[in-house]
């Protein structure tokens, strides 16, 4: 025999089955109308239409998906004007006149390579950067001029001194001891004291001129425009340790100038002896 709980469960299931079949509103009205002469038209919540009943069976997602908003195009000129002159005050580029902003004007001059107008405006102002570059170029040109002037002056002094020494001994020595020759007899003649004095005077002149040239070169600033120095400077951009060898290279270049100084003078002496070797 079923217990009370089972009876309640069976009744509850029957009630739910009847409500699921519909007619819940009629049953509710019948219950509410018992003992009353006025019939109400109450509607059960089970019979009320739900929002889900109006949903379509299938929907295209492209119709409900949010469309991407187009990105606004960037105005580069407006951005530059706002960055360069947006906070410059009433007299700057914020008023729509970038030419009246001194900072913007300076930037434009720098991008254009500098011109006669600078930070001081259009009334005879000069660009400090272009003026500095022009000064550096003039300084380099002046240093090159000083170096060439020193070299040319010493070249003239060297040639005059060597030629004077050679001509003097050539005219004062009457025999063939001062002339080179392939004749064994002439080559066997011992040199006289005059021939030895020529080389002594030559060595003395070279020593004096070399010392004077080194002293004069130190007073002229070097521009470091040699190919070797430029190569070291470019290589130091990738290998910074090479920069410490640049002073040593400058000293070697200075010593090489002195060596070529003496070698050129010796070459001139050899040339002069070769010219008089045709004398018989």
Swiss-Prot record:
Membrane-spanning residues: 150-170, 198-217, 258-278
Subcellular localization(s) per the UniProt record: Endoplasmic reticulum membrane; Golgi apparatus membrane
Bias (Polar residues) ranges: 31-43
Keyword Membrane among UniProt keywords: yes
Keyword Membrane: yes
GO biological process assignments: protein insertion into ER membrane; retrograde vesicle-mediated transport, Golgi to endoplasmic reticulum
Membrane topology: Multi-pass membrane protein
Stretches in topological domain Cytoplasmic: 1-149, 218-257
Span list, region Disordered: 15-59
Lumenal side: 171-197, 279-280
UniProt GO cellular component terms: endoplasmic reticulum membrane; GET complex; Golgi membrane
InterPro entries named in the record: GET2, Get2/sif1
Keywords, alphabetical: Endoplasmic reticulum, ER-Golgi transport, Golgi apparatus, Membrane, Transmembrane, Transmembrane helix, Transport
Biological role stated in the UniProt entry: Required for the post-translational delivery of tail-anchored (TA) proteins to the endoplasmic reticulum. Together with GET1, acts as a membrane receptor for soluble GET3, which recognizes and selectively binds the transmembrane domain of TA proteins in the cytosol. The GET complex cooperates with the HDEL receptor ERD2 to mediate the ATP-dependent retrieval of resident ER proteins that contain a C-terminal H-D-E-L retention signal from the Golgi to the ER.
Family that this chain belongs to: Belongs to the GET2 family.
Subunit (UniProt): Component of the Golgi to ER traffic (GET) complex, which is composed of GET1, GET2 and GET3. Within the complex, GET1 and GET2 form a heterotetramer which is stabilized by phosphatidylinositol binding and which binds to the GET3 homodimer.
Protein name: Golgi to ER traffic protein 2
Originating organism: Meyerozyma guilliermondii (strain ATCC 6260 / CBS 566 / DSM 6381 / JCM 1539 / NBRC 10279 / NRRL Y-324)
Gene it is expressed from: GET2
């Amino acid at each position: 025999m079923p217990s009370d709980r089972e009876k309640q469960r069976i009744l509850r299931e029957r009630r739910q089955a009847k409500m699921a079949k519909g007619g819940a509103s009629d049953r509710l009205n019948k219950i509410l109308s018992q003992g009353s002469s006025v019939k109400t038209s109450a509607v059960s919540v089970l019979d009320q239409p739900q929002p889900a009943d109006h949903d379509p069976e299938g929907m295209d997602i492209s119709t409900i998906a949010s469309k991407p908003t187009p990105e606004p195009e960037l105005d580069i000129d407006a951005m530059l004007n706002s960055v360069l002159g947006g906070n410059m005050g009433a007299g700057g580029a914020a008023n729509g006149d970038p030419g009246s902003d001194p900072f913007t004007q300076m930037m434009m001059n720098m991008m254009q390579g500098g011109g006669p107008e600078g930070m001081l405006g259009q009334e005879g102002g000069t660009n400090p950067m272009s003026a500095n570059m022009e000064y550096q170029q003039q300084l380099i040109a002046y240093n090159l001029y000083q170096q060439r002037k020193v070299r040319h002056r010493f070249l003239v002094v060297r040639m005059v001194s060597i030629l004077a020494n050679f001509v003097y001994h050539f005219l004062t020595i009457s025999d063939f001891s001062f002339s080179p020759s392939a004749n064994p007899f002439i080559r066997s003649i011992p040199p006289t004291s005059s021939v030895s004095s020529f080389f002594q005077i030559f060595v003395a002149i070279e020593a004096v001129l070399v010392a004077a040239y080194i002293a004069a070169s130190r007073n002229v600033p070097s521009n470091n425009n040699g190919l070797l120095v430029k190569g070291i400077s470019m290589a130091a951009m990738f290998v910074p340790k090479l920069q410490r060898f640049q002073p040593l290279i400058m000293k070697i270049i200075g010593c090489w100038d002195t060596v070529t100084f003496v070698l050129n003078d010796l070459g001139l002496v050899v040339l002069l002896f070769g010219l008089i070797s045709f004398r018989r």
